[in-house]
């Protein structure tokens, strides 16, 4: 198959694309943090820096792409919660306000991209269905986490 021949190039390109958006998110969280979520945003930024490093190091291993898919599924759940209550998700701090739906679609695209790279790295299609199902569960976990954050930090 044409794509499998270029799987290493596709994996590297995917890492670069995802990293660009995550670096923008880190910049927004560190230099333009939401006042009520400042501590959470610093911790998430630290995690995202570690995550970008892991992506670059292990980009040719299928398991990092499964982890990436699950992370973006939970990010999608987080951002859709904020969109549903008409508040910004602060996914990039206050750098780009009121764009929760944009972040949801970006997270969804990165979820699908991660599963696609997982498939290119020789994971069977049946296993991919399992990871997609698990991604739906992580979507719900991200949604529940956002609701908890809303109750604890915003409704004070």
What are these regions (language model features)?
Residues 1-156:
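Membrane-interfacial helix-loop segments of redox and metal-homeostasis proteins
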